[in-house]
Amino acid sequence: MKEFCIDFGEEQMEKLRQRIGCTRLPRTLNEGNWSLGTDSNYLQTLLDYWCDGYDWSRKQRELNQYPQFTCELDGVTIHFFHIPGSNKGAMPLLLTHGWPDSFLRYAKVFPLLSDYDLVVPSLPGFAFSTLPS
């Protein structure tokens, strides 16, 4: 088992911004009417926010305040949070996400579950866990 820290450097973030900026949205038949597909104006607003408005560094710092680890299981690297409970002998609580999701679903409730010994894995192929070969 190894300690883990989320560490996206500025170079990685710039590449992400470039990829987001290069996204070409399909033409839609009826803007604002979601019955015919996603509203491309909404998607463009979302892409702009991810490039220029979202504070990726702040989110990284928020997540790194909690202990994270990786371990190797049958050749697959599994990423997980292990947040010890506030009391010795706290009841363990395993929080697992589904598809298509990630541990981020639970990050907001970590502080609310401090009475429990939390284990929150990233399923194989999600977030920082690798896919089986």
For each predicted feature, which ranges?
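Mature N-terminal segment immediately following signal peptide/propeptide cleavage
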Residues: 1-23
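Catalytic cores of eukaryotic secretory-pathway lumenal/extracellular enzymes that build
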Residues: 4, 22-25, 41-133
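Zn2+-dependent metallopeptidase catalytic domains
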Residues: 26-31
